[in-house]
C-alpha cells in the first residue's frame, strides 16, 4: 500500500483541510492511505474521521525554523516512519519539513501553495526567505491556482491542482433550503448571503460587514451567515452591533453543511 504523509498545521475545518478530506474520502483506500503530521496538540475537527478512514495523526511541536528541538523532532519522526510521498501544505514554511524528508530519503516531496500572499507581520521576512528555499528541497510544486503558484514559486515550474468538490452536494435542493431557513428562523423570502472563513485578518471580515451594511440599507430583508471561528470574532460581533445589524447577521460557528447555502461571498484578497 502507498502511504502519503500530509504535513499541515492541524486538521480543522478550513479550506485546505477540507480539500484534503474531499480527496481522502474518494480515493481507493485499499491502495492508498493518508497520514497526517500536525503542528498543534489539541484535537481537531477532522481527527475522528481520519482515524475512521484508516489514517494516522502524528503531533509535532509548533513549527519554528530557529528551534533545534523542532528539527530533532522531525528527525526522530522520519527515523521511525517511512513514506513514499510527503506532501506539505505549510505554504512558505514547507521548506523545513521537506528538507528533513529529503535527508531521510523520501523520494517524492511536494510543496503545495494555497494562498497568493502572506500577512505582512513580524514573520513576513522569514517567510519570504523560506519560500525561496522550497525548490531546493521539493521534487514537485503544486498550487491551487496561477496567482498562488506565481507568488510562492516565482519562475519555477509548478502544477496547478484545482481544488475539487463534490458538485452533486451543491445542487439546488428546495427541501434543504427550507430546512436550514426554518432552523435559523429566516423567512423564505429573505435574501441570504453566506461566508465561510476563520475570523482572522486575511479573511477580511470588516470589509464584508461594511459591504453587507450597504446591502442591508437597500434590502432590510437581507441576512448574512458567517460560518467559522477565530480570535477576531469578538471584534466583528462588536462591529455588527455598532452598525445595528445584530438581528441580520448570524454567527454559526463551525458547520459541516456549508453546501446548504446558495450564495457565497469571499472578500479575502488572498483567496
Task: Please state what every model-predicted region is.
Residues 110-143, 152-153:
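A conserved, positively charged/aromatic
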Residues 88-94:
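Short His-centered aromatic/hydrophobic patch
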Residues 171-186:
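A short helix/loop element that forms part of the nucleotide-sugar donor recognition site in Leloir-type
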Amino acid at each position: 500500500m502507498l502511504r502519503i504523509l500530509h504535513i499541515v498545521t492541524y486538521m480543522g475545518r478550513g479550506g485546505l483541510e477540507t480539500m484534503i478530506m474531499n480527496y481522502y474520502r474518494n480515493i481507493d483506500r485499499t491502495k492508498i492511505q493518508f497520514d497526517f503530521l500536525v503542528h498543534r496538540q489539541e484535537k481537531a475537527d477532522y481527527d475522528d474521521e481520519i482515524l475512521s478512514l484508516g489514517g494516522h495523526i502524528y503531533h509535532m511541536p509548533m513549527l519554528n525554523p530557529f528551534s533545534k528541538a523542532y528539527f530533532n523532532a522531525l528527525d526522530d519522526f522520519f527515523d521511525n516512519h517511512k513514506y513514499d510521498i510527503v506532501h506539505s501544505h505549510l505554504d512558505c514554511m514547507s521548506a523545513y519539513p521537506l528538507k528533513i524528508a529529503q535527508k531521510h530519503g523520501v523520494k517524492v516531496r511536494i510543496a503545495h501553495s494555497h494562498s497568493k500572499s502572506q500577512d505582512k507581520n513580524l514573520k513576513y521576512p522569514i517567510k519570504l526567505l523560506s519560500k525561496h528555499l522550497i525548490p531546493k528541497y521539493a521534487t514537485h510544486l503544486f498550487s491551487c491556482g496561477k496567482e498562488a503558484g506565481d507568488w510562492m514559486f516565482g519562475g519555477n515550474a509548478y502544477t496547478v491542482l484545482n481544488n475539487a468538490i463534490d458538485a452533486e452536494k451543491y445542487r439546488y435542493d428546495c427541501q434543504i433550503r427550507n430546512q436550514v431557513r426554518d432552523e435559523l428562523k429566516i423567512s423564505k423570502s429573505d435574501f441570504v448571503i453566506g461566508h465561510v472563513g476563520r475570523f482572522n485578518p486575511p479573511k477580511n471580515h470588516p470589509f464584508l460587514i461594511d459591504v453587507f451594511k450597504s446591502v442591508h440599507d437597500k434590502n432590510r430583508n437581507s441576512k448574512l451567515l458567517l460560518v467559522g471561528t477565530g480570535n477576531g470574532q469578538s471584534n466583528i460581533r462588536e462591529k455588527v452591533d455598532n452598525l445595528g445589524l445584530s438581528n441580520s447577521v448570524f454567527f454559526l460557528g463551525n458547520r459541516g453543511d456549508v453546501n446548504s447555502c446558495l450564495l457565497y461571498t469571499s472578500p479575502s484578497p488572498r483567496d
